[in-house]
Amino acid sequence: MFTSSAAKTGRRRASTAKKSEDELVVDRVPNLIDGSISSGPISTGPDSDQNNKKKLPNPFAPKINNLGKDGQTIEQGSMLENKSRENEGDGGSPECVTPNHTDIGTSLGQVTTKGNECHDKYIGRGSPPNERGGSRPSQERGDSFVAIKYPSMLTTLAVMLNYDIHNLYEFMMAVLNVTKELNDPNVLVERAVFDAMQYSRSRGIGDRESYSMFCYMIHGYASLMRLAEEPWSDGVSSNESEIHIKASDMKKSVGVTLTVKPNSLWVCNKNDFARLICIFTLPDDIIAFLRTDGEDCYGGSNIYVGLDISKPPYIPLRDVEEP
């Protein structure tokens, strides 16, 4: 049958379009939960399965730095990775898919997820109940805690410690249950650990050893909540996309402005001077450090904020009684 040149040209164009579609390349977003990315862009071509299975360490995954005398650097999750594997089958994590997208709420505890069947059970609305009067809406805590109202802080902590985000969220929400009435930071941490352990154990989450690392997070989290109330703090301000924390620590003669963008693991302010893992303001017996990788940390170099996890936990875990 005779075929016109126009028809042949049309088929060639269709074939070319099909080939281009098969070879379409899409950038892959780093996986912040398992700390990995693909070895290259995502390919939908004939070798896509093989290409997309290759993974390299995520260059954007945070490192927890050990500022000990020997100058070692501890990689992300190295201390918890083996423990989490050993603990599989002993209660373990809730069988739940980690949400891929989080809507930023307007206050603490207002976290919603898209397409996550575990939303109501593990994320919930507001704080989980405790033994002393049930849950309290997060709004009662007021705007003085604006610095930590974004759930991306919890996500970042989970990534840092290689821990399940649902467990971490429940643990932190249990901590927030007791922060309103308590002023003394030591009592706050003690009581928070007790409440969180009781609540988490009742849900079959984690084990005793896992909580030793949580003490770091608890104190850092509580300290961040107090940041705006410290005498040396210049205050906290925020908008829908950024949090600005200005602080001048007179003991260390340090003045910094930290900018945090919700749902961002690595962030920089307009001067490109701050590159953050997470924000902790800790007492002297737990080292919170600003480590620079340049000559002048306020002149454009990166500033890393993290924890020295070589030291014992702030509150050693024991069979605590209710304070």
Curated annotation (Swiss-Prot):
Main location: host cell
Signal sequence region: none
Function according to Swiss-Prot or TrEMBL: Constituent of viral factories.
Entry's Gene Ontology cellular component terms: host cell cytoplasm
Annotated Polar residues bias: 99-115
Protein name: Non-structural protein 9
Keywords tagged on the record: Host cytoplasm
Region Disordered: start-end pairs: 1-142
Top-level lineage group: Viruses
Location(s) in or outside the cell: Host cytoplasm
KW rRNA processing (keyword) present: no
Taxonomic classification: Viruses, Riboviria, Orthornavirae, Duplornaviricota, Resentoviricetes
Annotated Low complexity bias: 33-49
Keyword Transcription: no
Intrachain disulfide bonds: none
